[in-house]
Amino acid sequence: MPPKGRQGAAKKVRRKEKKNVAHGHAHIKSTFNNTIVSITDPSGNVISWASAGHVGFKGSRKSTPFAAQMAAESAARRAQEHGMRKVDVFVKGPGSGRETAIRSLQATGLEVGSIQDVTPTPHNGCRPPKRRRV
């Protein structure tokens, strides 16, 4: 009786195809604890992303401007492999890595077309949580 299991059936591994996108959007979400950079095509499909935690920072070091710089560089390099050359930047959040992430996108060779602040602000909507007493 032959042993159970697969017999000579090789598993097919699908390679990730390279999209050729020259222009896209860079979404930078900068919170007090982390910075997330997502680079998308104009219709919103994510081409590359990186965050301060994904790059290798842990704990309170994720919230530093240097961590935001490294995350933006990592996302930009991967987007350039897909042919990205120009981005429009959308910045969201109050964190410390906002300007540093934009500067590092420019430094890696991506041409920054426009910069927009899309931080959501309430028109006096929900009641905020009570103040912290430390």
From Swiss-Prot:
It comes from Streptomyces avermitilis (strain ATCC 31267 / DSM 46492 / JCM 5070 / NBRC 14893 / NCIMB 12804 / NRRL 8165 / MA-4680). GO terms for molecular function: rRNA binding; structural constituent of ribosome. Residues 1-22, 114-134 are annotated as: Disordered. The keyword Ribonucleoprotein applies. GO terms for cellular component: ribonucleoprotein complex; ribosome. Located on the platform of the 30S subunit, it bridges several disparate RNA helices of the 16S rRNA. Forms part of the Shine-Dalgarno cleft in the 70S ribosome. GO terms for biological process: translation. This is Small ribosomal subunit protein uS11. It holds the Pfam family Ribosomal_S11. Residues 9-22 have a biased composition (Basic residues). NCBIfam families: PRK05309.1, uS11_bact. Belongs to the universal ribosomal protein uS11 family. The keyword Repeat does not apply. Keywords: Ribonucleoprotein, Ribosomal protein, RNA-binding, rRNA-binding. Part of the 30S ribosomal subunit. Interacts with proteins S7 and S18. Binds to IF-3. InterPro entries: Ribosomal_uS11, Ribosomal_uS11_bac-type, Ribosomal_uS11_CS, Ribosomal_uS11_sf.
